[in-house]
């Protein structure tokens, strides 16, 4: 089983180095990169896997959330839409799920949060409750982090305070299904935000997004083709020891 780590690369004159993300590195490589991730080699022989192409599932969106035509942006609106009742739709907490359904393998995506003051981002099981008020926690099928009124939290039970050295303008979510690993990274400075304790996943997982009525802004999913940033994942070739 591989450990989970990401290395964010800055601009370089070396044509082999691009702005992006190196993920899923073995323990040996993590040790190499721990103190000087900016100078880490790329191992260009590794196979490449590109970021997941995530769009929003409008059928799951709370009536106060407006999903863009392309399905990449969700915006809070004060007046709820008049929508038919559906068991797929969140009817109390303003959430929306991604179309992507994951039951194996690895996936990552990036979300532009900008200067918003409040949001939740992460993953959840496809069968989580969507009616009424509920607590987001791994015990209830949610693995997410939260920004609320300037403070960052991991939605563990109880919640874990996250002291960040720099405010993220973009957040990277990285999932390794078989390893039971969910990690979050600040795509602004390349720093690690939080990794949930190892889980044993079962069933289908989906990207999760939440807005708050206290902050009427938008969340934008970056495209797999690099609409927000150039994201490239290198898979490991060395086994972790």
Predicted region positions:
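Beta-rich ligand-recognition domains in immune and ubiquitin systems
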Residues: 1-241
């Amino acid at each position: 089983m591989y450990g989970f780590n990401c290395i964010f690369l800055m601009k370089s004159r070396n044509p082999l180095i691009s702005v992006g993300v190196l993920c899923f590195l073995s323990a040996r490589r993590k040790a190499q990169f721990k103190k000087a991730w900016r100078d880490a080699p790329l191992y260009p022989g590794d196979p490449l896997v590109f970021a997941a192409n995530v769009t929003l599932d409008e059928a799951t969106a709370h009536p106060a959330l407006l999903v863009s035509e392309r399905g990449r942006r969700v915006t809070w609106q004060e007046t709820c839409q008049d929508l038919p009742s559906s068991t797929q739709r969140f009817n109390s907490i303003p959430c929306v799920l991604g179309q992507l359904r994951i039951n194996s393998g690895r996936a990552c995506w990036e979300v532009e949060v900008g200067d918003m003051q409040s949001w939740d981002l992460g993953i959840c099981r496809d069968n989580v409750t969507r009616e009424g008020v509920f607590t987001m926690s791994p015990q209830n099928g949610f693995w997410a982090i939260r920004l609320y009124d300037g403070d960052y939290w991991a939605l563990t039970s109880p919640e874990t305070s996250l002291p960040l050295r720099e405010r993220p303008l973009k957040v990277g979510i990285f999932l390794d299904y078989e390893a039971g690993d969910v990690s979050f990274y600040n795509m602004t400075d390349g720093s690690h935000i939080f990794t949930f304790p190892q889980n044993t996943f079962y069933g289908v997982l989906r990207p999760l997004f939440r807005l708050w009525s206290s902050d009427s802004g938008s969340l934008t999913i970056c495209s797999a083709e690099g609409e927000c940033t150039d994201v490239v994942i290198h898979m490991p070739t060395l086994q972790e020891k």
